[in-house]
């Protein structure tokens, strides 16, 4: 568990397209409490174990907000091997501002790889959300030591919702599949996804996948 205070500044400005969130500029300040339990067998691509992470913020200053407000988000992940080369994974997460609406800018976003992959990055946004993800991981080959570790095939199903999001479908969900490599530069994932209401994407990602 960790307790502290975060301080910074936030400035939003439209450069192209139609404005979706307010234009704000100012100080951000929040007391923060973080809880983390990590019982996974690998920090990058786990095959066994579980993780629980929860963050609570009390924002006393945020550009555009009319008063102080709370934010809580929690994520739970579970990994279970079914053979030497294969494993399943499940994750669930959610967050809320507990009814606080005048937060200046939205506090939660969905869309992009691993967060409704068929949707555009941060396409859905609001102050309360949930996301479920379940999938299968299968080891394909091992890389030379100077290149990385292993390469996996990954398939997953994702479903989530952002309450109050503009133009959101009744049930945002998708299927995603691709190849994940644990390289010397970090995990690299390339794949595609097909979802509801004609959403579909090809994508690649360098960085944390789980």
Describe the predicted segments one by one.
Residues 193-199:
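A short, acidic, flexible beta-alpha connecting loop/helix-capping segment that sits on the rim
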Residues 20-21, 28-151, 163, 209:
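C-terminal outer-membrane beta-barrel translocator/porin domains of Gram-negative envelope proteins
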Residues 1-2, 44, 87-89, 187-189:
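Membrane-spanning beta-strand positions in outer-membrane beta-barrel proteins
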Residues 163-171:
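Small/polar, glycine/serine/threonine/aspartate-rich low-complexity segments that form flexible
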Residues 1-23:
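Transmembrane beta-barrel wall of Gram-negative outer-membrane proteins
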Residues 1-8, 36, 53-57, 91-95, ...:
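Transmembrane beta-strands of outer-membrane beta-barrel proteins
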């Amino acid at each position: 568990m960790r307790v502290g205070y975060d301080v910074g500044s936030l400035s939003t400005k439209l450069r192209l397209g139609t404005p979706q969130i307010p234009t704000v500029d100012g100080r951000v300040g929040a007391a923060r409490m973080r809880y983390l339990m990590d019982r996974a067998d690998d920090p990058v691509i786990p095959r066994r174990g579980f993780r629980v992470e929860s963050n609570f913020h009390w924002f006393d200053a945020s550009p555009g907000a009319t008063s102080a407000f709370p934010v809580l988000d929690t994520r739970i992940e579970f990994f279970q091997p079914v053979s030497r080369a294969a494993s399943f994974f499940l994750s669930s997460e959610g967050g809320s501002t507990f009814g606080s609406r005048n937060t200046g800018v939205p506090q939660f976003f969905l869309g992009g790889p691993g967060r409704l992959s068929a949707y555009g990055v941060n396409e859905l946004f609001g102050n309360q959300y949930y996301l479920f993800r379940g999938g299968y991981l299968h080891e394909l080959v091992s890389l030379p030591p100077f290149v990385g570790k292993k390469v996996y095939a990954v398939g997953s199903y994702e479903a989530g919702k952002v309450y109050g999001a503009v133009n959101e479908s009744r049930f945002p969900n998708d299927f995603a599949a691709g190849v994940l490599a644990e390289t010397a530069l970090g995990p690299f994932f390339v794949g595609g996804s097909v979802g509801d209401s004609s959403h579909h994407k090809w994508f690649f990602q360098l960085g944390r996948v789980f």
